[in-house]
Amino acid sequence: MRLFAFLYCLAVAVFSTQLKPQKSKAESIAAGEEIHQDFCVQCHLSNGEGVSGVFPPLKASDYLFENINRSIAGIKYGLKGEITVNDEIYDGVMANQGLEEEEIADVMNYILNQWGNQSEEFITPQQVAAVPKSILGQ
């Protein structure tokens, strides 16, 4: 009987962590703003415009909207090598910041909906988890 009670409690503990309710898009964007301030603003700036030729813009970025999964992978794994954003070539390194999948989803939702950017897409931690490093071609 004790073994059954122990296994039951263990199962409840394990499954309760798996059943975490999903944030709303607004909650995700709000959380993403904090992450952007902590990890992204130093290079991409608070206005999302980046620095021409050095740090690509997030505001009105054709690369971001045309390559959402690749953008997720860049945050998740880091990014190096040439990319073209709004017809300008960038050839730098963006280090992996060690963010959790939920944090990556939140910051992507923030970026996709700031500075005039608008996206119907709602990035989830599950989508982030499914993005492989191989998509970067590095």
Describe each region flagged by the PLM.
Residues 32, 36-46, 94, 107, ...:
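The canonical Cys-X-X-Cys-His
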